[in-house]
Amino acid sequence: MILTESPKLASGVKLKADPKYLEGAVTLNDDGKVEFTMETDANGKSAAQIYDIVYNYMSGLTQDKNNIASRVALVNPQEHVIANTMDEWIVFSQSFISLDRTEIKYQLVANIADNSLKLKMTRLYYNYEEGRSTGFKDAAENVITDKIALTKKKNGLAKIFGKFRKGTINRKDQIFSEIAELVKK
């Protein structure tokens, strides 16, 4: 039998969650707003080639099964900019008799140049259990930041807001990895 030790933080505190969700996973811009960014090269592709790939992907995002009212809000082929206004569901858990999900709204902006893609996810806002006493509407800064969505020791996800942080990071990772893979082909 092999015994493996639980992963720990530098302070020696045992981790209760995957490190990808812990301290520093949610980034803030200079204005203190939650903002996720990705920059990638595109295997030598021109700005026009990258634009077409990204436009097709971002158009497809608006047709996703969890889509509520997402749309491509801005296209500028000359400047190589595409912006989506996203409105979709993040499903936390689902069974035959229950569904736990939140509506998330955000902007997804792609800035493209030759051999380069910069993607930004910003202005995140949640609408949870609308019309119920346990429901709320709030910006990501009050829901998924380190101070709010992590335990005091920062070694796990907080009970209430941890699921929002995990769901948001998973969605961001999915979009960023899929689009990076497409432009690098």
Regions found by a protein language model. Give the residues of each.
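Ser/Thr-rich, low-complexity intrinsically disordered terminal regions
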Residues: 2-185
